C-alpha cells in the first residue's frame, strides 16, 4: 500500500521496483491503495501495464473512471485493448463502501456534483502520486477515460486547464461539460437511449472549431458500456477509442 499525501522515497522506490519486476509481455496488473492524507481518503487503483516495453518513447498513460454503480475494474475490454497498444491504464476507484449512496428520492444534482468534485480530486492525486513514483511513463500527456459519472469526472478534470491533460474520452457522460479548447482533444461516444444535459456536448460549430469527435452508436444502451455489455458494442467502443488515441482519427460507427 502506498501512503502519505505525497509518496515517500521508500514508497516510490518500492512501487517502481514492483512495476519494473513484472515481465512487460504479460500485460500484468497491480492493485494498490493510495492514501490522500489531506482529505483522509483511500483511493484504490489498478495499474494495467503495457503488453510490450516502450523503447523509443515513454509509454502513454490513461486514467480510467467507472460509471456509478459499476466496479472500477469492469472495463477490461477497453483496458486490454489499450495495453496491447502500449498504454499504461490506471483504473481509479471513486466509490468506496463508506461513501454515501445516491438517493434517488432526493434531488440528485447536488449529490452528483459532490461525487464529481471528489472524483476530480482523486484523479489529481493519483496522477501526482504515480508521476513521482514511476516517472518513466508519459505523465506530461495524460488521457482521461470515463463512463457516465466517470465521464463527467473526466470531463471536469480535463476542463481545469492543466496542461498535462491532453485528451479525454467519455462514454455517454451526461452532466459534466466537455472542454472547449484546442489544447484538449475530445472523443465522446454516445449511447442511443439517453440525452446529455444542455451544454455538455460541443455543438457542431464547436466540434469543428476545436476538433472534438462525437460518435453516436445506434442501438447502444448507456448501461451496457462496460464488460457486461454485448460484444458488438464493446468492439465498437474499442475501435473508436483506438482510432482516436492511436491514429488521431474520428471514426463514426458503421
Please state what every model-predicted region is.
Residues 2-6, 10-51:
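An N-terminal hydrophobic leader/cap segment in hydrolases
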Residues 33-137:
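Serine-hydrolase catalytic machinery in alpha/beta-hydrolase-like enzymes
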Residues 93-94, 216-218:
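Residue-level recognition of beta-strand->loop/alpha-helix junctions
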Residues 127-182:
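Primarily recognizes the serine-hydrolase "nucleophile elbow" in alpha/beta-hydrolase
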Residues 187-190:
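Short beta-strand/loop motif that positions the catalytic acidic residue
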Residues 180, 195-201:
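Conserved alpha/beta-hydrolase "acid-adjacent" motif
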Residues 246-254:
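Alpha/beta-hydrolase-fold serine-hydrolase catalytic core, especially in secreted/extracellular enzymes
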Residues 220-233:
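Catalytic histidine-centered segment of alpha/beta-hydrolase-like enzymes
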Amino acid at each position: 500500500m502506498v501512503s502519505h499525501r505525497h509518496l515517500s522515497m521508500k514508497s516510490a522506490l518500492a512501487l517502481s521496483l514492483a512495476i519494473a519486476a513484472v515481465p512487460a509481455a504479460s500485460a500484468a496488473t497491480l492493485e494498490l491503495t493510495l492514501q490522500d492524507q489531506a482529505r483522509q481518503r483511500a483511493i484504490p487503483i489498478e495499474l494495467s501495464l503495457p503488453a510490450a516495453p516502450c523503447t523509443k518513447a515513454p509509454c502513454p498513460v490513461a486514467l480510467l473512471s467507472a460509471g456509478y454503480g459499476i466496479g472500477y475494474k469492469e472495463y477490461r475490454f477497453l483496458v486490454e485493448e489499450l495495453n496491447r497498444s502500449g498504454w499504461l491504464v490506471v483504473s481509479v476507484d471513486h466509490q468506496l463502501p463508506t461513501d454515501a449512496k445516491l438517493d434517488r428520492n432526493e434531488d440528485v444534482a447536488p449529490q452528483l456534483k459532490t461525487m464529481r468534485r471528489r472524483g476530480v480530486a482523486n484523479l489529481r492525486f493519483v496522477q501526482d502520486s504515480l508521476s513521482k513514483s514511476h516517472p518513466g511513463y508519459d505523465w506530461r500527456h495524460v488521457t482521461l477515460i470515463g463512463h457516465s459519472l466517470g465521464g463527467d469526472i473526466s470531463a471536469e478534470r480535463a476542463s481545469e486547464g492543466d496542461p498535462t491533460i491532453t485528451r479525454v474520452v467519455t462514454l455517454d457522460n451526461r452532466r459534466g461539460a466537455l472542454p472547449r479548447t484546442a489544447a484538449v482533444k475530445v472523443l465522446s461516444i454516445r449511447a442511443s437511449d439517453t440525452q446529455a444535459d444542455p451544454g455538455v456536448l460541443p455543438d457542431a460549430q464547436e466540434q469543428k472549431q476545436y476538433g472534438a469527435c462525437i460518435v453516436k452508436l445506434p442501438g447502444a444502451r448507456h448501461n451496457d458500456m462496460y464488460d457486461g455489455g454485448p460484444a458488438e458494442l464493446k468492439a465498437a467502443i474499442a475501435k473508436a477509442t483506438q482510432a482516436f488515441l492511436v491514429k488521431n482519427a474520428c471514426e463514426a460507427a458503421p
